[in-house]
């Protein structure tokens, strides 16, 4: 995953986190939308640099009662406010998740309020989600936050088909922080990946940049 920080626009990559969905059930047999991720992760890069990244930065607007699980808190979990309320869960309680005979107990470190589907689910550490799936090392997708330049005609042309660009057009496009060029470069360094924009939030600090959320599907 650290390859994401090796692209030409590496300094425009703000944060990223893997996501892995698990179809699990709780102690009552009820289906619980479960997601494995990095909450706050220290990553050593091949360049010798290190970064701190994770869902705590990508979802900084979430309301958290309690705290985010620490990187080394193997059994820590975030529980959505809707699920917690309907099951009488508070910080410090235990949530038991099972998938196809594999069972794990998790401690509720925080209760999240997002205003979306996350409120109905449970978030756990990525290795624990992999253990429930019995698939070590697997990742479903990676969400990437990047600073990008607003699209123009060249960017839109490239987004449709990069191969339609002339040599000079492709050089200009590749060396400009368009969302399509950053997505293209992520696909170059991540084998068998597809990167696409999923959300854009305008930045208003006198700089013509946008903060774009990219979802890279592996």
Label every model-predicted segment.
Residues 18-22, 32-38, 49, 56-131, ...:
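Hydrophobic secondary-structure segments that place a key small or acidic residue at a functional site
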Residues 100-103, 111-214:
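Mechanotransmission and gating elements of multispan inner-membrane complexes involved in transport
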Residues 49-54, 156-160:
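Short, flexible, mixed-charge acidic loops at enzyme active sites
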Residues 1-35, 184-194:
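Hydrophobic, regular-secondary-structure patches
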Residues 216-218:
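Selective detector of the "anchor" transmembrane alpha-helix that sits immediately C-terminal
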Residues 13, 49-52, 74, 205:
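Acidic-residue sensor for enzyme active/binding pockets
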Residues 7, 40-44:
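Short helix C-cap/helix-to-loop transition motifs enriched in small/turn-promoting residues
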Residues 39-41, 201-202:
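Active-site/binding-pocket entry motifs
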């Amino acid at each position: 995953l650290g390859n994401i920080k090796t692209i030409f626009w590496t300094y425009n990559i703000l944060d990223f986190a893997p996501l892995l969905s698990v179809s699990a059930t709780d102690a009552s047999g009820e289906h619980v939308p479960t997601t494995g991720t990095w909450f706050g992760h220290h990553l050593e890069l091949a360049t010798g640099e290190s970064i701190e990244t994770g869902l705590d930065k990508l979802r900084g607007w979430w309301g958290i009662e309690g705290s985010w699980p620490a990187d080394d808190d193997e059994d820590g979990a975030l529980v959505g406010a809707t699920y917690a309320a309907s099951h009488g869960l508070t910080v410090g309680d235990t949530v038991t998740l099972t998938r196809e005979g594999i069972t794990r107990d998790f401690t509720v470190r925080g209760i999240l309020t997002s205003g979306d589907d996350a409120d109905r689910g449970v978030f756990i550490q990525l290795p624990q989600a992999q253990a429930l799936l019995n698939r070590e090392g697997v990742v479903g997708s990676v969400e990437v936050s990047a600073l990008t330049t607003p699209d123009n005609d060249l960017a839109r042309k490239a987004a449709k088909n990069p191969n339609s660009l002339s040599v000079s057009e492709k050089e200009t496009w590749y060396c400009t922080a368009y969302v399509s060029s950053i997505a293209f470069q992520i696909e170059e360094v991540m084998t068998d990946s597809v990167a696409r924009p999923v959300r854009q939030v305008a930045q208003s600090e006198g700089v013509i940049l946008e903060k774009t959320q990219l979802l890279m599907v592996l």
